[in-house]
Amino acid sequence: VPIRSLDSGHRDQILAHLQALEPADRYLRFGYAANDEQIRRYVDQIAFERDVLFGIFNRRLHLIAMAHLAFSVDPQLRTCAEFGVSVAKASRGKGYGSRLFERAVVHARN
């Protein structure tokens, strides 16, 4: 299954993927049980020109897994980034999260 780069044209699919997460999964992804409005604000504020997002789509072209590598805006922390990953419940156990993490590490090193 290929990993694709995501851009602002994928914003609606990112929103749908994240809002489909169950409360416990939202807590794991965001560090708190984000509600739909909080997720919408998060997606609206993604800085695609600075950050890097990767996704995996199923055969129906639904986003089933995604990773967000968010780089610090603080000039003193230019080498710092935050990583977030989520995988749709039905797609877990297939190594998608690990593959997205590996891709993010390679990108961050370069």
Annotate each language-model stretch with its function.
Residues 1-110:
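Long, contiguous binding/interaction regions
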